[in-house]
Amino acid sequence: MIVNTPAIVLKSFPYGESSLIARCFSEENGKVSLIIKGARRIKSSKASYFQPLNYIDIIYNHKLNRELHVISKVSYKKYWSKILDDLYKVSLAISILELTDKTLSDNDPHPSLFLILKEVLAAYNNTLIDPKVLFWFYECALLNNLGFQPNLEDPDLPGLTLPEIKNDANCIF
């Protein structure tokens, strides 16, 4: 089945002498692993599409009994260049991608989480919002989508006792 879907590149790594394997989070199929044959050849321009933090449009051949799917076409949908200007934003954005990659299973669609991830990365591209707040927001959204939403309304928080700190100048965070 031929699939045409937007996707965010989570991770890519070399495979063999000239190929590349990319793990992408797509809107329709969730996390998918794609093989890009010949992407590491000198004349190929496909490797640049599969760098983490790229928002791309992909067309690939999806086979139900396989873990790796062969890519046929790719194009940029959006390029968030301002994230790369700030090392702190890059580290938080890559951490978000790593969280997404490690927590979601393959071919498990989460369209609402995809939209949230896209909006969070777009917000990282703008300089108006605190990067830590965006990171925490995405963590809560991810937990909510996975069914582990914390109940922050309960003031007692059972099982959690915080120590009394008299002088917080000696605390290391």
PLM features per residue range, with description:
Residues 1-20, 25-173:
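Non-catalytic alpha-helical scaffolds and adjoining flexible linkers that form interface surfaces
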